[in-house]
């Protein structure tokens, strides 16, 4: 039997770089919220212990794909602790709607969905804490998708405090370019010393993203989309880009602006949600 699992997008409602560690990783403060929009992962169990991704990504080797890496990591961790039923395997496919290099967390969300779904389907019985710890080895954003609640994140993104920001409507626009995260984080002009503040203080301030100035400077497409969106609503970059978003109080307001978008702008309208669609599907 084939089952389907949501793999939602996220937005960084704000993102501040507070420092850089000796190992090169940047410390930050950010606010994650999910969208009721994303990829869909389909899983069909097999009994020969194999993992197969039926929808490969061009340019990414099968074993390097985060989906396959997540499945194999869960398989090894559960097996090492005697919690993997004999023969556990899976055929996995993905209906991909989220762009790569868009700042929407697509790859991290895919990995988290696979960890949560296979833990359930294989009946491994690992806790969310264990899954989140595994997820962190795959990527800094994976734990928030595993835990499934909007969160204030610190450290390199792994220290999570659940929060409930307003669930607004968003017009999310993709400028048509992909921005690899290292391009932003290695830029010498990236702000790296924004003062740390409490979540209470940050929620009262106007939200912004320290990466935005670099993305706008280096990618004229990002600058063009933001310039257009800012004529209609508060707008900013998510993550390290390339996607940008404008926030609205109602769906109709967001859709009216999308209808006026220039032909070169690709976008969608989605609602911000504090409970991940993945976890909502499991209730």
Swiss-Prot record:
Active site location: 10, 141
Pathway, per record: Isoprenoid biosynthesis; isopentenyl diphosphate biosynthesis via DXP pathway; isopentenyl diphosphate from 1-deoxy-D-xylulose 5-phosphate: step 3/6
Family the entry assigns: Belongs to the GHMP kinase family. IspE subfamily.
GO biological process: isopentenyl diphosphate biosynthetic process, methylerythritol 4-phosphate pathway; terpenoid biosynthetic process
Binding site for ATP: 99-109
GO MF annotation, one: ATP binding
Protein name listed in UniProt: 4-diphosphocytidyl-2-C-methyl-D-erythritol kinase
PANTHER family per record: 4-DIPHOSPHOCYTIDYL-2-C-METHYL-D-ERYTHRITOL KINASE, CHLOROPLASTIC
Listed InterPro entries: GHMP_kinase_C_dom, GHMP_kinase_C_sf, GHMP_kinase_N_dom, IspE, Ribosomal_Su5_D2-typ_SF, Ribsml_uS5_D2-typ_fold_subgr
Reactions mediated catalytically: 4-CDP-2-C-methyl-D-erythritol + ATP = 4-CDP-2-C-methyl-D-erythritol 2-phosphate + ADP + H(+)
E.C. designation(s): 2.7.1.148
Gene3D superfamilies: 3.30.230.10, GHMP kinase, C-terminal domain
Record note on quaternary structure: Homodimer.
Organism per entry: Escherichia coli O139:H28 (strain E24377A / ETEC)
Keywords recorded for this protein, A-Z: ATP-binding, Isoprene biosynthesis, Kinase, Nucleotide-binding, Transferase
Function, as annotated: Catalyzes the phosphorylation of the position 2 hydroxy group of 4-diphosphocytidyl-2C-methyl-D-erythritol.
Domain of life: Bacteria
């Amino acid at each position: 039997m084939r089952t389907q699992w949501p793999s939602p997008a996220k937005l960084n409602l704000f993102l501040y770089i507070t420092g850089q560690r000796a190992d090169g990783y940047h410390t930050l403060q950010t606010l994650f919220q999910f969208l009721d929009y994303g990829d869909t992962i389909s899983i069909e169990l097999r009994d020969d212990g194999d993992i197969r991704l039926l929808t490969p990504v061009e340019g990414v080797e099968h074993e390097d794909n985060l989906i396959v890496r997540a499945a194999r990591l869960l398989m090894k961790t559960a097996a090492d602790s005697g919690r993997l039923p004999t023969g556990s395997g899976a055929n996995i496919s993905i209906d991909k709607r989220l762009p790569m290099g868009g700042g929407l967390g697509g790859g991290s969300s895919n990995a988290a969905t696979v960890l949560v779904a296979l833990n359930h389907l294989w009946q491994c019985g690992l806790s969310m804490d264990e899954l989140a710890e595994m997820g962190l080895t795959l990527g800094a954003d994976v734990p928030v998708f595993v835990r499934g609640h909007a969160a204030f994140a610190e450290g390199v993104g792994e220290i999570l405090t659940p929060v409930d920001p307003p669930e607004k409507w968003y017009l999310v626009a993709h400028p048509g370019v992909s921005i690899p995260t290292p391009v932003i984080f290695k830029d010498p002009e990236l702000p790296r010393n924004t003062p740390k503040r409490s979540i209470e203080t940050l929620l009262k301030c106007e939200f912004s993203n320290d990466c935005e100035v670099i993305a706008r400077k280096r990618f004229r497409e990002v600058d063009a989309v933001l310039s257009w969106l800012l004529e209609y609503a508060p707008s900013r970059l998510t993550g390290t880009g390339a996607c940008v978003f404008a926030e609205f109080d109602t769906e109709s307001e967001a859709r009216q602006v999308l209808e006026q978008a220039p032909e070169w702008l690709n976008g969608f309208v989605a609602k911000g949600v504090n409970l991940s669609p993945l976890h909502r599907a499991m209730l």
